[in-house]
Amino acid sequence: MISSLHRPTLAKVDLSAISENIEQVVSHIPKQVQTFAVVKANAYGHGAVEVAKHVSKQVDGFCVSNLDEALELRQAGIEQPILILGVVLPDGVPLAIQENISLTVASLEWLALAQKQGLDLTGLTCHIKVDSGMGRIGVRNLKDADNLIAGLKALGADVEGIFTHFATADEADDSKFKRQLSFFTDLVDNLTARPRLVHASNSATSIWHATTVFNTVRLGVVIYGLNPSGSVLELPYNIQPALSLETALIHVKTLPAGQEVGYGATYTTTAEEVIGTLPIGYADGWTRDLQGFHVIVDGQLCPIVGRVSMDQITVRLPKVYPLGTPVTLMGENGGASITATEVAEKRGTINYEVLCLLSDRVPRSYD
C-alpha cells in the first residue's frame, strides 16, 4: 500500500521514548537477564526496521511473528539474533539457516514432517514452545518436550531455547498465571537436556511479576509506552507513549440546526454548529466504532459526529478554525491528551490493536 505523503495525516514515532522505556523496564528486572525486543506486526505499528535499528545496542535480540518479518530485518542490516515466535513449516528451514534466523518448534508433528522431507537441520537454531495453558501452540508435557529436543538435535539443530507464554499476566487475578508458571517451571526443571535460554516473561510479566523471570525476557508493548493491561493494573513506574497520531482540518463549515451529517444520516445538528472535516478514516485504521469519540483541536476535545468514512471523519468544533489547523487523534495538544488505551476503551478492544491497525496509508515520521 502506498503511504499518503501528500495529506496532513501522520503518525509521529519518538524513538528516544522507546529507548527510555527499555531502560526503565530493564532497570526493574534481575541483572544478567537477556532482553529481546518484540518488533512483530511492524513493531506494533511503529515501524520494525526503524525501531530495531534504533534500539539494536540496547537489546540482545529481536522477536517477530513470521519469516517475512525476520527477513525484513535481515535485509535492513539487522545482525542481532532474531527469533520467530510463530510456527514456520519445515520448508522454510533452508532460508532460516541461510539468514541465521531462529525458529520456534512447537510439536512432534513438525519434527516428523522435517524427517519425512529428509531435512538436515545443521545450522538451524530453534526454541521449543511449551503450551502451559494458553492453548495455541506448543508441546504440553515433559515427554514430548524431551523427545522433541532429542529429535531436533539428532537432525543437527541447535536447540538454544525453550519458552512459554502467559495468558493472564496482565490481570488482577493471578491464579492462572501461577498455574502456568508452576507447570512451565516444573517441566523445565525436569528436562533431560535443558536449553541455554529459558523465557516466559512478556511485557506484563516483566512489569508485575519481575521476580519470576528466567534468564531471558521478551519486551513487547511496554517498550512502546503502553500499559499491557489497559487500565486494569497500575504501572509501578512511568513509561512514555512513543506514537502520536495527527492530522489537520481540510474543510470547515457552519451548518444550521436540523442538518444531517455523514453516511446513514446518523447525526443531526441540534443548533447552528461548526463542522470540521479531517482526512483520516477506517482505511487508515481509525475505525467506524469511533463515532462519538473525540479529537483535540486547539487544546479542546471535539466530538466525532456522523459515521467514520473510509477516508474522512467529521468533528464538531467550538468555533471556526482556519484550514490546516493541527488536530490530534492520539497524543497531546494544548494541555489535553488522548491515549491509545482511551481509544481502545471506546472501541471495546485493547491498546495493542489500536496501534497495529494503523495502516500503511499513514506515513510514520521519526524523532
Swiss-Prot record:
Enzyme Commission no: 5.1.1.1
Reaction catalyzed: L-alanine = D-alanine
Binding site for substrate: R136, M310
Cofactor(s), names only, from the UniProt record: pyridoxal 5'-phosphate
UniProt keyword Isomerase, yes or no: yes
Active site: K40, Y263
Residues with the N6-(pyridoxal phosphate)lysine modification: K40
Isomerase among keywords: yes
Domain of life according to the entry: Bacteria
UniProt-recorded Gene Ontology molecular function terms: alanine racemase activity; pyridoxal phosphate binding
Job description of the protein: Catalyzes the interconversion of L-alanine and D-alanine. May also act on other amino acids.
Family: Belongs to the alanine racemase family.
Protein name as catalogued: Alanine racemase
Originating organism: Streptococcus thermophilus (strain CNRZ 1066)
Gene that encodes the chain: alr
